[in-house]
């Protein structure tokens, strides 16, 4: 038991050190019901100002507000329909009070703006939420696009999955992403929560337009020489458990 405990501590320490080196990010998924247009107004017109000031002060590197793209017009699946994605330079920064930038709204927004936020917020309800923390294992950031695909998986070999993405696919996308409209790519390792129902890793592919993203999904063929080198069928035999598309609504860089 003592050896097992020591092994667990060493493994957690390795993850924490890696997160300190490469940064971490959180994905806060929401289920919002009611007048979602008003919810989007609150986030894009008012809370974006608060997030932007936090980024300019150096409290956070970046925060984005995104909307799920369901591909139909009837919201009957009761799934999460929004997500906040926020990056931090370290675990310490993630746990800092400065990371809760929304608490500064009263210092940033005028009295009139705060009153409008209160009125708009009365028209919708947060019905459910779930926050997930990842370490950024490696990414390519050439810009911010309008649409992003998040890919979640539970690979049998997490280290193998991540290393193949870094050594095989990252160099490939660095050379080819411009031609397909991809502006951002990366792979993350799940830090929390960890259980049998959650993904262990996440990758992302961001594009300028939804059309470019969909063309990537259905019409892009990976080169045969790289596929021969790939061991992803061994690392992740079940493939991705979910591939969700989100639209950028607002971010702290605007």
Enumerate the language-model features and the residues they cover.
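Bacterial Sec-dependent N-terminal signal peptides
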Residues: 1-22
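Short S/T/G/P-rich N-terminal loop/turn motif that feeds into the first structured element of a domain
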Residues: 19-108, 115-254
């Amino acid at each position: 038991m003592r050896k097992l405990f020591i092994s667990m501590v060493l493994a957690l320490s390795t993850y924490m050190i890696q997160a300190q080196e490469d940064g971490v990010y959180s994905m806060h998924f929401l289920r919002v019901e009611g007048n979602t247009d008003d919810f989007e107004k609150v986030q894009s017109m008012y809370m974006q100002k608060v997030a932007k000031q936090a980024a300019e002060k150096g409290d956070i590197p970046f925060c984005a507000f995104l909307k799920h793209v369901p591909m139909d017009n009837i919201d009957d699946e009761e799934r999460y329909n929004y997500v906040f994605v926020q990056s931090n330079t370290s675990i310490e920064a993630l746990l800092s009070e400065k990371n809760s930038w929304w608490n500064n709204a009263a210092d940033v927004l005028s009295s009139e703006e705060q009153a409008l936020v209160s009125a708009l917020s009365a028209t919708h309800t947060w019905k459910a939420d779930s926050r997930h923390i990842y370490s950024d294992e490696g990414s390519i950031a050439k810009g911010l696009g309008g649409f992003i695909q998040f890919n979640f998986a539970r690979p049998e070999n997490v280290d193998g999955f991540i290393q193949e993405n870094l050594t095989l696919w990252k160099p490939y996308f660095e050379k080819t992403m411009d031609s397909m409209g991809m502006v951002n790519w990366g792979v993350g390792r799940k830090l929390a929560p960890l259980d049998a129902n959650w993904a262990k890793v996440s990758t992302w592919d961001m594009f300028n337009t939804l059309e470019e993203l969909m063309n990537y999904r259905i019409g892009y063929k990976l080169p045969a020489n790289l596929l021969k080198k790939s061991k992803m069928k061994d690392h992740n035999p079940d493939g991705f458990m979910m591939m969700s598309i989100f639209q950028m609504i607002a971010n702290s860089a605007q």
